[in-house]
């Protein structure tokens, strides 16, 4: 690995430790040429998961799309950015744990709704209205009835 200060290619590891979530190793290195220290991170390469859309098109899974959808659904609601990121992280982790190469966008949408329902019911209804393409007020009322019953 090249030193970011002098581009020398040899270094020694001074310290190694796992990050809090145990998915990455943080290493402190010292350049054998200029003796400056720098940090590197080592992570297992993820296998890309493809999302199968309604029209059967495929695209790489993108956690940011989940975060953006949640931000819109949670606007002006008491849901923090951290809660939104936690939901997206939990969904990403759940998909990764399935060890699949493809997942239907429908399944991801259902996961988002399940998590969002536990955090804020208004945000859940907002997300569901877009995701399930509510056609009229009766569809909203039906979803709210289901929410109250459960």
UniProtKB/Swiss-Prot annotation:
Where the record annotates domain ATP-cone, the positions are 49-139
Source taxonomy: Bacteria, Bacillati, Bacillota, Clostridia, Eubacteriales
The protein's superkingdom reads Bacteria
What protein is this chain from?
Transcriptional repressor NrdR
Q: Which organism is it from?
A: Clostridium botulinum (strain Eklund 17B / Type B)
**UniProt KW keywords:** ATP-binding, DNA-binding, Metal-binding, Nucleotide-binding, Repressor, Transcription, Transcription regulation, Zinc, Zinc-finger
Q: Where are the zinc fingers (unnamed)?
A: 3-34
Coiled-coil portions: none
Q: Which family does it belong to?
A: Belongs to the NrdR family.
Q: How is the cofactor bound?
A: Binds 1 zinc ion.
Identify the cofactor(s).
Zn(2+)
Chain's role: Negatively regulates transcription of bacterial ribonucleotide reductase nrd genes and operons by binding to NrdR-boxes.
Q: Example GO biological process term?
A: negative regulation of DNA-templated transcription
Q: Name one GO molecular function term.
A: ATP binding
